[in-house]
Amino acid sequence: MSQITVADISRWQGTINWDQFKGAVSGVVIKATGADGGLYTDGMLAYNRDRARERGVPIWFYHYKGSGNARQEAEYFVNAIGGLRAGEALVLDDENEGKVNVAWDAEFADHIKELIFRLRFNGIHIYTK
């Protein structure tokens, strides 16, 4: 079995030299949003997303779970990313130290699926005459 190295990237790592970083990892998990203390977008999301895409580094985006409304957090998360590309995935970071709320997580995941379906199929419009 080969080893896969995936790095957790957020504003806490500062500005990454993606040219050096590219060959060191198999992929990255980029923090997109969080809700610990209110909804927010990670300050380095756009930079990290764009640099990873430019260099062909596989990306998974994550949302750091808060304790608010699951549907609202899911919507904020999807909107902040600005669209997914082929092969990119979404991840929920649930670090409630053994107190996982399965119903909340399921509602979040269900709404993510609804949003992705709506974005994929409502994002293409054809007008003909």
Task: Set out the residue ranges of the language-model regions.
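Substrate-binding cleft of extracellular glycoside hydrolase catalytic domains
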Residues: 2-123
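Acidic carboxylate-rich catalytic motifs and surrounding loops in phosphoryl-/glycosyl-chemistry enzymes
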Residues: 126-129
